[in-house]
Amino acid sequence: MEKTTPTQYDVKVQYNNSILNYAIDHSDQLTDIQKELIQFTKENIERHIMLTQAEQCSFFKLLIQVLNAKKTIDIGVFTGLSSLTAALAMGDEGRVVACDVSTDYTQHALKFWAKAGVDHKINLKIQPASKTLQELIDQGEENTYDFVFIDADKTGYDTYYELSLKLIRKGGIIAIDNVLQHGRVADPNANVEPNLVAIRALNDKILADKRVTKTMLPIADGITLVTKIN
C-alpha cells in the first residue's frame, strides 16, 4: 500500500492568556530578578514587545541544563533577559557571549546582570554580531559552543545561522526566534517586506539543510531548534 503523508494538521488547543499563564505557572518559576527585569522593560521601554517571553525562558533553561551547557551565545540582547536566563541556568563556570550593536538597551541589562550576581559570566560585545561570531571562529572556538539563541535583526539571520553552525558543537542546539512572524509566514496575502522575506527564506533553507536535525515549535512567535549532526 502506498504511504500517504498528511498535509493538514489541526490545532488541538486554542491558546489564550489563561492557558498561557496556566502553563507558565506549572513550569519552573522565573527568579525575582527576571521578573523585575520584565516589569522594568514593560514599564520603561517603548519596544518592550522585543522582550523574550516568560515561557521561552523556562524552555531555554531546560534546554541549557539538559545540554549541561558551559558556553552559550546570545545574538540580540535587548534589555538582557535571554542572557540573564542562560547565565542563571549554568553553573559558575558557564559563560555567555552576548552580542548587540547598541548600548541603548544593554545599559539596563548590565544593571540587572550585576544585581543577579551573574555579570561575571556574561561577556557583552557591542559590535555587529557577525563580527563577534567571526572573531570567535578566528580564535579557534569552532565546535565548542553548546547553545546559541538568535533573536536579532531578521535580515541578518542567515549570516548568524551559518556562523553559529561553525561554532556549535555536534549535538549543540541553535534556537532561532520569530520564525512565524506573527503568522505571516503562512499567509499568502501577507505584506511582503524584508523581514518576512528573510525569515521565509531561512525557514525553507533549514528545512532542506542536511547538516542539522530541526523542529519548528509554535512557542511565542515561533522557535526553530536545530542540532548539528556532524
From Swiss-Prot:
Keywords for this entry? Metal-binding, Methyltransferase, S-adenosyl-L-methionine, Transferase
Any idea which positions bind a divalent metal cation?
D151, D177, N178
Q: Where does S-adenosyl-L-methionine bind?
A: T52, D74, G76, V77, S82, D100, A129, D151, D153, Y160
Q: Where on the tree of life does the source sit, at the highest rank?
A: Eukaryota
Q: Which residues form the signal peptide?
A: none
Q: Among the record's GO biological process terms, what is one?
A: methylation
Q: Which reaction does it catalyse?
A: (E)-caffeoyl-CoA + S-adenosyl-L-methionine = (E)-feruloyl-CoA + S-adenosyl-L-homocysteine + H(+)
EC number of this enzyme: 2.1.1.104
> What Pfam families does the record point to?
Methyltransf_3
Q: A single Gene Ontology molecular function, please?
A: metal ion binding
PANTHER family given for it? Answer: CAFFEOYL-COA O-METHYLTRANSFERASE 1-RELATED, O-METHYLTRANSFERASE-RELATED
Family listed: Belongs to the class I-like SAM-binding methyltransferase superfamily. Cation-dependent O-methyltransferase family. CCoAMT subfamily.
| The protein, known as | Probable caffeoyl-CoA O-methyltransferase 1
